[in-house]
Amino acid sequence: MAAAAMAISPSIHLHLHLHLHHPPRLHRLLHLSTTSPYPWLSAWPTAHRRRVPLRRPASALDLRPEPSPSSDSDDDAAFGTSRSSSRSAMSLILSRLRNSGYSYSPPELPPRPPRGSVEDVFRVDDGVVPNARGGFDDDAESALVDARFPWELPMPPPEAGPRAARSKAWMAELTLPEAELRRLRHAGMRLKSRIKVGGAGVTREIVERIRDRWRNDEVVRIKVTGTPALNMRLFHEILERKTGGLVIWRSGTSVSLYRGVAYDIPEPTKGTSKNTQTLGMKSSIKEPPGHSLLPNEKVNEMQDNNGALVSNAEKDTLVEPVPEIKYEDEIDKLLDELGPRYDDWPRPDPSPVDADLLPATVPGYKPPFRVLPYGVRPSLSRRDTTNLRRLARGLPPHFALGRSRQLQGLAAAMVKLWEKSSIAKIALKRGVQLTTSERMAEDIKKLTGGVMLSRNNDFMVFYRGKDFLSPELAEKLLERERWAKSLQDEEQARLNAASSFSSRTEAPVEPTVAGTLGETLEANSKYGNKLDENYENKMTRTVEAARHADLVRKLEWKLQLAQKKIEKAERVLGKVETALKPTEGIQPPETITDEERFMFRKLGLRMKAFLLLGRRGVFDGTIENMHLHWKYRELVKILVKAKSFGDVKKIALSLEAESGGILVSVDKVSKGYAIVVFRGKDYARPSKLRPRNLLSKRKALARSIEIQRREALSHHIATLNRRVKKLKAELLQMEGVKEEGDVELYAKLDSAYSSDEEDVEDEDDEAYLRSFDNSVAVQNGDDRTSLDGSDANSDDEGDYSDEDDDEDDDNDEEDGFDYENDDEDDVPPTTSDGDLYNHTDFGSSDSENYVSLSGRGDPDVKSKGSALDSRNSYSEQSTELTNTCS
């Protein structure tokens, strides 16, 4: 009993300690931690271990007022729930039945937290942990199993050491004991001399130096610089593969290389058996034993459509099974036939041919003979070029080149390679000085006649071309060409010998003159009509009349073409003006007196801030800038550069109607015409500054260009009509003087003939619909700045859709003028009568033309204004514009 009491006492002591120092829930966790590897999972209620359906997601934050118990909500009817209790109608019925005693009532659920509280917004079911995406899974069991802390994950088995998780490249750690590896690393640290590896990588010289060091030391220190230092993991693998040693330590660009335990008898490592060829010698590849084919059954290598090497062994239907041919063996055999291999190739096998060891010059070398088949396009299409480039991207290089000239040996090897492969890929050696890939590519193209597909700092890819011929076929064609040339030379020699031989026995025969030019001239001199002066004049008039009629027909054809163009311009202009709905001229609700008009004109002309109206005319941006200007001033001065006063009058009336202001005056100033508009006494800024009934900035530019094109075509048509009428009249005059010549008329006709501009071909009929003429920008160079401050010579736009109007609106908001003027901020918005008559100095603008815009007001002031009108305005313009405004 005492022993039992002694055995139980520790557990009793633990329970007493838990009850005294820990709360009940923590007590439960500590109690279950001794029996479960995951105590926090075992501590959860058993109800959560089953598949528990999650609650219906509610809104994150619902601040709507609480509904009354008697009110019915449409939202509740839609979801079948009650907003106050989040329960369905069926659950309410069941709760009432349970309260009446008809069914068993389960324990009540905890009350829902108040709406809008932190618990309501960030509520999560107990035991459910968010997944990796931050959401919750429908499967509660999977959520419980996968939601583990890192320290709760299953531990790896004890026998699995830390070395197994590391990279496989550290072969030294897997093969050497820990104590031996530590000793070798310390020995490498004590070494002072290091072997430097440059940009060329692990070359043959580097391998020889490492092996020389291994004769005395078992560890060699290596320092890596240049391009190989960018990828030390790859350098690690290349160094072990080429030297046969083991990398025991690596830090940054420093490496310690161990020669190995059995250095005296080195075993060939992976990839070194294929790089043991002697320089300048070709290795012979023997056929596999037991394999002998007849000459007719020899496996021929052909090309598929993409240029890859394909064996015909699969196509031959032989009774005996054909052995499988590996691609690596075939490509090694092909490269061995081309020349010596590059031993310092840092990339995986197969190693390419060293082009620097090929002969620099080949006696009697000529570019290969090429003949393009009939009906074949000489150049490659884009699709073919792309396919060939993609094919060459995955192929290993065939040659490694490091020199820029004397490439005849490489060219001969490439031609030999093209017999079996349509692509030749050349790798450029790294670390070689004074090499230019561009010069290499040009020399190779001249020597081989191939097509360069791609060129970069690492590779060059050449295609043999569609006109490439195999050596057998090229030799046959050259032989036939030489044979044909010999036949031609023999025939020419026979003709030369026959012409030099003459027979003396026969009498010489005179050559006949029948059908020759001499016979024709002799017959005309004997039997033809002699050309006198009348005949020459008659022929001259006939020729002139024919030329005149031809010119008339040509002008009529041009007239028809111009009429077609103007019809198209009218259609395009009508299409652009579909969105233009100008406001009809309505009398403004308020007017100003003559005194106010005189004062406003004086102040407006003296304003320094102004708006420049460009070639676009009145559009939505114009009205917007007027309202922006009226934010700081009551007046706005607009400068217009127009050809006639009628155009200025239309613009002024349009500005008054669209902006809702009052037109004050239109004056002729040095910069064109100045239009002064008053915003009104009861001015209220509209909600939308840009009226929707006007054109946008882009469409206004298109409209101005189409109008200018129509005017130019109209002028051109009028000119053509005048010329046609004039030529027809001269043609009738020529018929009147048919019998006798008229020197003055012929001189006039010579001046009316077509010049060089008549021979210029007309442009495409639809070209002007897609682009804007550059001449428009030159002719309107002064009108480059529009009302919104943007450049009128914008990029050509052929599509005048409404989709780009919003982008134009944003650009207009960024652009604009600075309407602030420090000198004018002190000027009061209104001027008294005394100030009106005291300011007699009107400046330079008083000498310009002034137009009165109203016939109403005080007669005294009106008489004073008439004196100014007689001195400063045009009477016709004033009367016309005044009648229109009144």
UniProtKB/Swiss-Prot annotation:
Disruption phenotype: Albino leaves with little, if any, plastid rRNA.
Biased composition (Acidic residues): 793-827
Keywords: Chloroplast, Coiled coil, Mitochondrion, mRNA processing, mRNA splicing, Plastid, Repeat, Ribonucleoprotein, RNA-binding, Transit peptide
A GO CC term attached to the entry: mitochondrion
Compartments, as annotated in UniProt: Plastid, Chloroplast; Mitochondrion
Pfam families: CRS1_YhbY (PF01985)
Polar residues biased stretches: 270-281, 841-852, 869-886
GO molecular function per UniProt: mRNA binding
Annotated CRM domain residues: 174-270, 378-475, 590-690
Xref: SMART domains: CRS1_YhbY
Superkingdom as given in the UniProt entry: Eukaryota
Region (Disordered): 56-84, 269-291, 771-886
GO biological process: Group II intron splicing; mRNA processing
InterPro entries, sorted: CRS1/CFM2/CFM3, RNA-binding_CRM, YhbY-like_sf
Database matches in SUPFAM superfamilies: YhbY-like
Transit peptide as recorded in UniProt: 1-70
Self-association and partners: Interacts with RNA. Part of large ribonucleo-protein particles that contain CAF1 and/or CAF2, and RNC1.
UniProt function note: Binds specific group II introns in chloroplasts and facilitates their splicing. Acts on subgroup IIB introns. The substrates of the subgroup IIB also require the CRM domain proteins CAF1 or CAF2, with a simultaneous binding of CFM3 and CAF1 or CAF2. May influence the biogenesis of the mitochondrial small ribosomal subunit.
Record-given protein name: CRM-domain containing factor CFM3, chloroplastic/mitochondrial
Species of origin: Oryza sativa subsp. japonica
Gene this protein is translated from: CFM3
